[in-house]
């Protein structure tokens, strides 16, 4: 009986030490692999600045590698209230580097000499970016319709007030 208990104790100790060493090596390799996964930029918000005639995009980098936004472009499509004609601006240099796990603001200046945005105007922005692990070029497209969400939210609030009366 004594040899059985000693043998069982040695076997359990071996399993614990082996499991601990194995999980350490596995987790360290897995952690290194996850650290090298580039994130794709996420546009968190877009706001129009009337005075400067630009749209400021808040862009997040959820990855563990820096992302460099090299170019930006956009297509302007007028809404019902706008007198402006549609236009496209492309190949606008950006050179904005977003560090890992952080947020940056990228400004997109609208065409000079054009009128300010009206409710319903659509600006579809394209951001071209790269990351250090590849020579490939990636893009993110974000549509921004001026004033529509604000107008819808105001209408919803008014409807709720009427329903509560």
Curated annotation (Swiss-Prot):
Keyword Transmembrane set for record: yes
GO CC terms, sorted: membrane
Chief location category: membrane
Membrane topology: Single-pass membrane protein
Segments traversing the membrane: 4-26
Keywords recorded for this protein, A-Z: Membrane, Transmembrane, Transmembrane helix
Subcellular location: Membrane
Protein's name according to its UniProt entry: Uncharacterized protein aq_758
Species: Aquifex aeolicus (strain VF5)
